[in-house]
Amino acid sequence: MENKVIQDRLTLLRAKMQEEGIDFYMMPTADFHNSEYVNDYFKVREYFSNFTGSNGTLLVWKDGAGLWTDGRYFIQAETELEGTGVELFRMLQEGVPTIEEFLEQNMQQGQTLGFDGRVIAAMDGKKYEKVLAKAQICIAYEKDLADSIWTDRPNFPAGKVTVLDEKIAGKSVEEKLTQTREKMAKDGANALLLT
């Protein structure tokens, strides 16, 4: 049975890719902090594939699309991808290329891989650079193509920070700050960056 909604979304995405000069577009399951479970705003992969599992990467190109996921989700992915035109790539199965291998085998010199670099781990970005540089393939890191297509996209999460009670946290904010400052002074640190 065809999934016209997903097929139409992929058609819009491919048109946007062509407009932006992108030949392959990648969408992982991630947010700006590389969380495994993401807020609805970041469910871009799900929006374009119908796959709702917590782990997977969608890759779209001119005449195809593929979803890479692990063994926990093979059955779920088969069901949810049915009729979408998205092919399932079963990670770690014999004969199934990794995303890097697929890109290396299918991208040609001068082509461009695009993705929203804010949701790709730096380590993965460097891995793609290394693999694709040999073939003189460009990478466009700053492309959130979903934003112009997903018109009813949920709002970006903007909740307030919640301070946990000492019963849960074990110590007060003041105690934690004092301990941190003492450790910094002991180690000769002038600043501490927390992300």
For every predicted segment, state its role.
Residues M1-T195:
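Terminal domain-start leader segments
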